[in-house]
Amino acid sequence: MSIDWSRIYPTGMEEEPNRQGLEFYWNIFRELKKYNIEPLVTIWHGETPLYIENELLGWANRKTIELFKKYARTLFEEYKGVVHYWLTFNEINNALMFLNLLPTESAANDAQRTFTLLHHRLLASAEIVQMGHAIDPENKIGCMICYGESYPATCNPKDVIADMELKQMQQFYCSDVQVRGAYPSYSNRIWEKYGVQLDVTAEDRAVLKAGTVDFYSFSYYCTSLV
């Protein structure tokens, strides 16, 4: 199940959470407990408050990280001892899977924005993993990847390499950061290919290293040939 950020902080800018929103999920958790169902809760499932999207440009703005941390802290503290299993972002790699799906004249700008917002989400994930463990050491916090298996169309080395590079970008780029705590070496090739310049500071790298997830989860839809 997922919790909707805007139910808890309607604009994202409020200092105090919406109590009615918190109670809405309390009712769900009480019902789950009645039937001995252990919830696995996704903190972000695409429901960034509209105000943040309109006024801050959403995850393209680093300020969104702090607002998300406020929201996540509220959940960890409110449902401590009730929820033990969390996912930071649902299908965090979707932004890469859909990159340039519909070619436009601004493809380079789309790539820069996509990799920038992903960097901010990966930082936010790492920060709230650390936060969740500090609030309740019993918390298990994982990542969630949209995974689609692919195979090279032939044994031609060009097809094999194309398949490998597709997997690296769409399937492994995000999960390598979340599981291993650092951008993989092949990320430099991907950034160069798309003309992307990321502002990755030494502090960012330390945050990613310290905030690795406890487990890996994925959704699976289909298999493809490359």
Annotate each predicted stretch with a short phrase:
Residues 11-13, 23-226:
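Active-site region of glycoside hydrolase catalytic domains
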Residues 5:
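N-terminal cofactor/phosphate-binding cores enriched in small/glycine residues
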